[in-house]
Amino acid sequence: MILREEKGFTYGARTRFSGSRLPGTFTASSGVRSNTTEESVNIFKNLMTAYKNPINEEDLKFTKNVTLRSNARQFETLGALRRMISNIANYDLPFDYINNQEKIVREMTIDSHNALVKKYIRPDEMIYLIVGDAATQLNGMKSLGFGNPVILDKEGNSL
């Protein structure tokens, strides 16, 4: 919300967890104007670091509502239904797994939320991938304290 509503840097920023039978990833992403890259990355960094702070009841309620409402999208289109059925088959899930997930979300407490954040959100282990012109962006990225950047060409080869 900061990047879009407060700063006007982007039309949207998103986060997601993805997984399979193997451990998955947490991704936070956004497309921003080149002249806002450094500040935008710093906002992401600060937000991720702020997850260490305990959540309050209002934020927990908001998160629960967003999560529960987003489940409705799993039933909106034939493609979404196909993906849900595919997940049931691929991961040997019970047919009512959505109900089970919603129950877990409804029963989430501040303490259980904070324990999950502590376990899975580890900003010091995150990889920041910035796509842009190194000539204009590299110095700004160095100033954020991420260590030495790895610069890749468009084919993914180290430069």
How would you name each of these model-derived features?
Residues M1-T10, S20-R21, N53-D111, F146:
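Short acidic/His-enriched helical or mixed secondary-structure segments at domain edges of catalytic enzymes
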Residues M1-E38, R83-M84, E102-R122, N148-L159:
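Non-catalytic beta-strand/loop surface segments
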Residues G12, R16, D96, T136:
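Short, electropositive, low-hydrophobicity segments enriched in small/polar residues
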Residues D124-M126:
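Non-catalytic, conformational "gating/processing" segments within enzyme and secreted inhibitor domains
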Residues I130-L159:
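An aromatic/glycine/proline-enriched structural segment found at the starts
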Residues R14-Q74, K142, E155-S158:
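M16/insulysin-pitrilysin zinc metalloprotease superfamily fold
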